[in-house]
Amino acid sequence: MADQRMDISSTISDFMSPGATDLLSSPLGTSGMDCNRKRKGSSTDYQESMDTDKDDPHGRLEYTEHQGRIKNAREAHSQIEKRRRDKMNSFIDELASLVPTCNAMSRKLDKLTVLRMAVQHMKTLRGATNPYTEANYKPTFLSDDELKHLILRAADGFLFVVGCDRGKILFVSESVFKILNYSQNDLIGQSLFDYLHPKDIAKVKEQLSSSDTAPRERLIDAKTGLPVKTDITPGPSRLCSGARRSFFCRMKCNRPSVKVEDKDFPSTCSKKKADRKSFCTIHSTGYLKSWPPTKMGLDEDNEPDNEGCNLSCLVAIGRLHSHVVPQPVNGEIRVKSMEYVSRHAIDGKFVFVDQRATAILAYLPQELLGTSCYEYFHQDDIGHLAECHRQVLQTREKITTNCYKFKIKDGSFITLRSRWFSFMNPWTKEVEYIVSTNTVVLANVLEGGDPTFPQLTASPHSMDSMLPSGEGGPKRTHPTVPGIPGGTRAGAGKIGRMIAEEVMEIHRIRGSSPSSCGSSPLNITSTPPPDASSPGGKKILNGGTPDIPSSGLPPGQAQENPGYPYSDSSSILGENPHIGIDMIDNDQGSSSPSNDEAAMAVIMSLLEADAGLGGPVDFSDLPWPL
């Protein structure tokens, strides 16, 4: 046992000896020792370098400069980014002000919304929301030749294609011979500017400008500065609104040469006229279109400008514009007549006047508003115009007046002719106003007559009888002297009010009396007027109700009444001056509610029509109590 213990202790001591320890730790611990050594060395070196930099003033300065450069670079970058953001914001704001949809918004929009609305607006302008390509314009069942013949036949012209860069005629249809007398072979390949009038070349060049079409994008090499040839496949041609063209130009006509002698052109002016006749005016309508050079067969032009760009051409239809100049009759030039529009109330007062009236009448619109048109009519034309006034209130048709004289601001008269029509409120069924289109009639039209305006038959009655002798005086005609005030009737503004009250009374009676529903406004009933000796007739006539002549009353039926203050026998109620009293006298025995209502309507209308213009109305002799 002791020997075994000694062997074990010797073995352990051998194992724990330094040599054995090196043998065990050599394969495993060598790398770890080296790593620790490296770590210690690296950290030591860094610390030493830091201590050296701190101790060395030169190293400390370099370190400070390095940190300053980093800080300055960061600040410069932030300033650049800030300026870029400011520019972008300013452009976004400017774009928002140019787009109508953005400008109409009350709140400020974000950048994405502004850009989206700008894109939508550009698509709307260029027609890109619903693009029209070549295939959309041609039906599938028509070939190209058939479509070309149909277009030429419908347009009655010739089709031509012109290059926008040089004005070279690339194609022209055979129908050009009918208009310009040039064959197709004579024009193809020639310059369009050689056949234009010298004064029209600049205008045609402006129309050939392709700035509105798709931009010609080119890639430029930064080193050489030359354009780079790209293989970009062009998309389908789009007919945008900016590519449309329509213009007039003068082109040469190849008319057959005629031998002209010198005596035929005695002056330079005649030669200029002959040269002018060799041109004809052509109306060209078409659009600008872009083709790749390979499609046009222009690859032989190996110019650097043609690389990577499309060829813009004008495709148009040329039609002969005929000069239609009417020949003057009797050496006079017919011009459009001057006219103005006015709107009147039912009593003839101005409620609206067109601004063109100032150049014709010399009145400002505010000077005419609220005044009656009868104040400006000549006294000889009041009767005819009153009849037209009554007719336009009773019918829905347009009434054309005869030529009449209208007093302008300087006191003289101008000749007018008017078309009147009334506007009826669809809800109340009442006339609200009268629209009058007034046309100036020249002296030559008055002498020769104008078939477009039929003349109406003038009334045999004079409107002098419509006003009392105290206001307008007895009937007499004053000679009209241009430039001197006169010719109008004092107090004529009441005539329109009297006509309006007459028509309103007619409609009121028609609405209240069942027996008169089917009668005409101009002839309420066929009952003859009562005799002037009857009590009712005397009292009503003495009431002084204004009287207006009716256009439908024949002259033979007019009865003079000395007790009536006016010379005409027509009443404010129409042809029958006392329709209400006569109807009541015939039905005295019956007291139906309809008759009572009709009687009260007549009484109320007489009270309203009187309006303080005449004397008091005496109803003491009426056959029934009030």
Curated annotation (Swiss-Prot):
Post-translational modification summary for this protein: Ubiquitinated, leading to its proteasomal degradation. Deubiquitinated by USP9X. O-glycosylated; contains O-GlcNAc. O-glycosylation by OGT prevents protein degradation by inhibiting ubiquitination. It also stabilizes the CLOCK-BMAL1 heterodimer thereby increasing CLOCK-BMAL1-mediated transcription of genes in the negative loop of the circadian clock such as PER1/2/3 and CRY1/2.
Residues recorded with modification Phosphoserine: S17, S78, S90
UniProt cross-references to CDD domains, sorted A to Z: bHLH-PAS_ARNTL_PASD3, PAS
Biological processes annotated in GO: circadian regulation of gene expression; circadian rhythm; negative regulation of DNA-templated transcription; negative regulation of fat cell differentiation; negative regulation of nuclear receptor-mediated glucocorticoid signaling pathway; negative regulation of TOR signaling; oxidative stress-induced premature senescence; positive regulation of canonical Wnt signaling pathway
Regions of compositional bias (Gly residues) in chain numbering: 484-493
Biased composition (Low complexity): 511-521
Domain named PAC: residues: 401-444
Residue numbers carrying Phosphothreonine: T21
Crosslinked residue numbers (Glycyl lysine isopeptide (Lys-Gly) (interchain with G-Cter in SUMO2)): K259
Location within or outside the cell: Nucleus; Cytoplasm; Nucleus, PML body
GO MF annotation terms: DNA-binding transcription factor activity, RNA polymerase II-specific; E-box binding; protein dimerization activity; RNA polymerase II cis-regulatory region sequence-specific DNA binding; sequence-specific DNA binding; transcription cis-regulatory region binding
Record domain bHLH: where: 72-125
Domain PAS: 143-215, 326-396
Keyword vocabulary terms for this entry: Acetylation, Activator, Biological rhythms, Cytoplasm, DNA-binding, Isopeptide bond, Nucleus, Phosphoprotein, Repeat, Transcription, Transcription regulation, Ubl conjugation
InterPro entries to which the protein is assigned, alphabetical: bHLH_dom, Circadian_TF, HLH_DNA-bd_sf, Nuc_translocat, PAC, PAS, PAS-like_dom_sf, PAS_fold
Stated role: Transcriptional activator which forms a core component of the circadian clock. The circadian clock, an internal time-keeping system, regulates various physiological processes through the generation of approximately 24 hour circadian rhythms in gene expression, which are translated into rhythms in metabolism and behavior. It is derived from the Latin roots 'circa' (about) and 'diem' (day) and acts as an important regulator of a wide array of physiological functions including metabolism, sleep, body temperature, blood pressure, endocrine, immune, cardiovascular, and renal function.
PANTHER family: CIRCADIAN PROTEIN CLOCK/ARNT/BMAL/PAS
Name of the molecule in the record: Basic helix-loop-helix ARNT-like protein 1
Gene: BMAL1
